């Protein structure tokens, strides 16, 4: 997400707020895939990694409903890519991290003794998924932290 905050409160945020999250978290990746999928098919080993979120996998906070729903949509997109591209060697994976130290989470305080994951941990996870052979396909990788209940 390139936004600077989580959002989409069930009872408080506007419909425009929800639209913005779907524009960034679902429609943006959809447009990129539509542009690149034909070339990825030609390679026979194309790879697509969507960074989703545990919030899209297991939403627990109604204050970030829009964020969670848009990330769930991104996960659905990844599943559609994986099925559509399978016979042409295209593999797609959703990486679903928990709380990561980013600009978006800067304002979120965590309980004593807890910590946010570093972005490098997610980068390593993505790198791993990209190196798998075509015979090994991973639909999703959940990267939990002890802060999962905050999502």
Mark where each language-model region is:
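Substrate-binding pocket helix/loop in short-chain dehydrogenase/reductase
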Residues: 9-10, 14-22
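Active-site loop-to-helix junction immediately N-terminal to the catalytic Tyr of the SDR YXXXK motif
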Residues: 13, 59-68, 80, 109
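Active-site helix of classical SDR
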Residues: 33, 70
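C-terminal helical subdomain
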Residues: 87-90, 94, 111-151
